[in-house]
């Protein structure tokens, strides 16, 4: 009698994805982040569900409902902080996952890569809308500033912004629809993640060398299930350290002040994971130009497969490209720092230089480095 996991229609799918999946024998811990993202998403959906049971999406009661969750609901505080800091862990894993893809040339799996970019955009949209829900000062003004960017679109901009707002300013209608979208998007993300996995399993995983690994495969279970459990344990440890010791470390103190349309905070800034894009947006004096740069800073990932000029897939044996990659990482960290600083000298010029560097490294320096390495292969 054959095993039920290989014959049952549903079990067969699980088996082929997580048990008998042929995986390269040499994938490193950088390949853990996919499963960690799955854990993050599940955690966010579960904690979010329990928060939604007590939250009210009304401008008059939203702030106090969040306070009520923290003070009066059984373990409400831990659910709230797991959800808030879970978003930070989610983005750490996302950035690591994308960085891994860039370093090891995983972007040559076109469908998987493009679905991944859509997932990144969807996650960013979800996080932004979630940040608006507590209805603190930063929630309100963040929503006002970011939605206002759409008014830079010629001709239809103003109408579009008012349509999204559901009125002439960020108000009750805006909060209600943001809650609705924030609730539904994670389920769309989950569906997209399944498609992402479907496309990945058409080709199989890449590996650190970038060389096809068809001749050397091992079953996913038990080798990578145990490795994923270790990664998950470390993720939960990091998250709980954050939640139980410094839950407000990554938040903004301004968000503990209820939203007041008559009082603008001195420095409007998004959560830390958007600061790099915010710095790029602010570095361009023109509104439309800034918005385009903001979108392109993420959309540039679509071009990665077409900017790949190297004869080798991975950067493992390409020291010049490795240097370029780490300069890019340093540049992104610089942009993240600048995004949180006030708009004054010397931060303005540093932000502008870092923004120019960002696009220059990806569009010019990395392809040139690859071409030089191709020439060096002939030596």
Curated annotation (Swiss-Prot):
InterPro entries xref list: Cyt_b/b6_C, Cyt_b/b6_C_sf, Cyt_b/b6_N, Cytb/b6-like_sf, Cytochrome_b, Cytochrome_b_C_euk/bac, Cytochrome_b_N_euk/bac, Di-haem_cyt_TM
Positions binding heme b b562 in this chain are 83, 182
The terms describing its cellular component in GO are: mitochondrial inner membrane; respiratory chain complex III
Membrane topology per record: Multi-pass membrane protein
Q: Which SUPFAM superfamilies match?
A: a domain/subunit of cytochrome bc1 complex (Ubiquinol-cytochrome c reductase) (SSF81648), Transmembrane di-heme cytochromes (SSF81342)
How many cofactor units bind, and how?
Answer: Binds 2 heme b groups non-covalently.
Q: What are the entry keywords?
A: Electron transport, Heme, Iron, Membrane, Metal-binding, Mitochondrion, Mitochondrion inner membrane, Respiratory chain, Transmembrane, Transmembrane helix, Transport, Ubiquinone
Q: Where are the transmembrane segments?
A: 33-53, 77-98, 113-133, 178-198, 226-246, 288-308, 320-340, 347-367
Job of this protein? Component of the ubiquinol-cytochrome c reductase complex (complex III or cytochrome b-c1 complex) that is part of the mitochondrial respiratory chain. The b-c1 complex mediates electron transfer from ubiquinol to cytochrome c. Contributes to the generation of a proton gradient across the mitochondrial membrane that is then used for ATP synthesis.
Q: What is this protein called?
A: Cytochrome b
Q: Which gene encodes it?
A: MT-CYB
């Amino acid at each position: 009698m054959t095993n039920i996991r290989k014959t049952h229609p549903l079990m067969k799918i699980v088996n082929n994805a997580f048990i008998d999946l042929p995986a390269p024998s040499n994938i490193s811990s950088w390949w853990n982040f996919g499963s960690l993202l799955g854990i993050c998403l599940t955690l966010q959906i579960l904690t979010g569900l329990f928060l939604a049971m007590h939250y009210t999406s009304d401008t008059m009661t939203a702030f106090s409902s969040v306070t009520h969750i923290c003070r009066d609901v059984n373990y409400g505080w831990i659910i709230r902080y797991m959800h808030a800091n879970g978003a930070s862990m989610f983005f750490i894993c996302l950035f690591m996952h994308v960085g891994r893809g860039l370093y090891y040339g995983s972007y040559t799996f076109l469908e998987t890569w493009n679905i991944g970019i859509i997932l990144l955009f969807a996650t960013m949209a979800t996080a932004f809308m979630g940040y608006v829900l507590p209805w603190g000062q930063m929630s309100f003004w963040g929503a006002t500033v970011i939605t206002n960017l759409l008014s830079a679109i010629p001709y239809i901009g103003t109408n579009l912004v008012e349509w999204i707002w559901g009125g002439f300013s960020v108000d009750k209608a805006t909060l209600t629809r943001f809650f609705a979208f924030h609730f539904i998007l994670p389920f769309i993300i989950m569906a997209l993640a399944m498609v992402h996995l479907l496309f990945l399993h058409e080709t199989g995983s890449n590996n650190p060398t970038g060389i096809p690994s068809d001749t050397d495969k091992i079953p996913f279970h038990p080798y990578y299930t145990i490795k994923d459990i270790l990664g998950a344990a470390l993720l939960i440890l990091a998250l709980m350290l954050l939640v139980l010791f410094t839950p407000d470390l990554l938040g903004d103190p301004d968000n503990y002040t209820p939203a007041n349309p008559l009082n603008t905070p001195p420095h409007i800034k998004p959560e830390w994971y958007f600061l790099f894009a915010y710095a790029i947006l602010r570095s361009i004096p023109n509104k439309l130009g800034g918005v385009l740069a903001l979108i392109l800073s993420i959309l540039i990932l679509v071009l990665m497969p077409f900017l790949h000029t190297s004869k080798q897939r991975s950067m493992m044996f390409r020291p010049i490209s490795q240097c370029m990659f780490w300069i890019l990482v340093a540049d992104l960290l610089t942009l993240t720092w600048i995004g949180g600083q006030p708009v004054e000298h010397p931060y303005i010029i540093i932000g502008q230089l870092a923004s120019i560097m960002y696009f220059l490294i990806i569009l010019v320096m990395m392809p040139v480095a690859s071409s030089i390495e191709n020439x060096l292969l002939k030596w």
